[in-house]
Amino acid sequence: MMAIRELKVCLLGDTGVGKSSIVCRFVQDHFDHNISPTIGASFMTKTVPCGNELHKFLIWDTAGQERFHSLAPMYYRGSAAAVIVYDITKQDSFHTLKKWVKELKEHGPENIVMAIAGNKCDLSDIREVPLKDAKEYAESIGAIVVETSAKNAINIEELFQGISRQIPPLGPQENGNSGGIKLGNQSLQASRRCC
């Protein structure tokens, strides 16, 4: 029987870059042309095989609007990975991506896997962000970089497979461990002392 690992993943980025569309395409293999902006955050799951394990992605799709920015730490806290999404047709979204990366490095989990998704690659004829720039930036921060199209289902699976490959496998002693706090039995007598 394969071990199932739950991996919390959050999606960050400007409003309108396609975070929700990426999640819908990955989880439901569906694209909605009229998707509404996310309010706060939404949550979906999908389990995929990775080596001798199953990775159950617990995906938090965060709102991109500035007014919801202060909620983001609640979603990336404890995350195994973060997908920072930008729109290849909007240079501003790539600049905002760098702010998200800075915030993750300062306040996120120490060993978080970072993936950069340049979404809307189906619109490459109106591209503002060269892939070369994204690759150089990703390399400078040790992140995965993938250009995606949620609309045309390009590289969506590859994005999450790339994240899976970056997650270290469980060691033999960790199999079956939920990762929670271990409680041990200690003698109460030793701890009962008067001040």
UniProtKB/Swiss-Prot annotation:
It is a lipid-anchor. Residues 168-195 are annotated as: Disordered. GO terms for cellular component: cytoplasm; early endosome; early phagosome membrane; late endosome; phagocytic cup; phagocytic vesicle; trans-Golgi network membrane. The small GTPases Rab are key regulators of intracellular membrane trafficking, from the formation of transport vesicles to their fusion with membranes. Rabs cycle between an inactive GDP-bound form and an active GTP-bound form that is able to recruit to membranes different set of downstream effectors directly responsible for vesicle formation, movement, tethering and fusion. Required for the integrity and for normal function of the Golgi apparatus and the trans-Golgi network. Plays a role in insulin-stimulated translocation of GLUT4 to the cell membrane. The modification Phosphoserine is found at S36. It comes from Mus musculus (Mouse). This is Ras-related protein Rab-31. A lipid is attached at C194, C195 (S-geranylgeranyl cysteine). Detected in brain astrocytes (at protein level). Interacts with OCRL. Interacts (in GDP-bound form) with RIN3 and GAPVD1, which function as guanine exchange factors (GEF). Interacts with EGFR. Interacts with NGFR. Interacts (in GTP-bound form) with EEA1. Interacts (in GTP-bound form) with APPL2; interaction contributes to or enhances recruitment of APPL2 to the phagosomes; interaction enhances Fc-gamma receptor-mediated phagocytosis through PI3K/Akt signaling in macrophages. Switch 1, switch 2 and the interswitch regions are characteristic of Rab GTPases and mediate the interactions with Rab downstream effectors. The switch regions undergo conformational changes upon nucleotide binding which drive interaction with specific sets of effector proteins, with most effectors only binding to GTP-bound Rab. Belongs to the small GTPase superfamily. Rab family. The gene is Rab31. Mg(2+) binds at S20, T38. It is found in: Early endosome; Golgi apparatus, trans-Golgi network; Golgi apparatus, trans-Golgi network membrane; Cytoplasmic vesicle, Phagosome. GO terms for molecular function: GDP binding; GTP binding; GTPase activity. PROSITE patterns: RAB (PS51419). Keywords: Cytoplasmic vesicle, Endosome, Golgi apparatus, GTP-binding, Hydrolase, Lipoprotein, Magnesium, Membrane, Metal-binding, Nucleotide-binding, Phosphoprotein, Prenylation. GTP binds at G16, G18, K19, S20, S21, D32, H33, T38, G64, N119, D122, A150, K151.
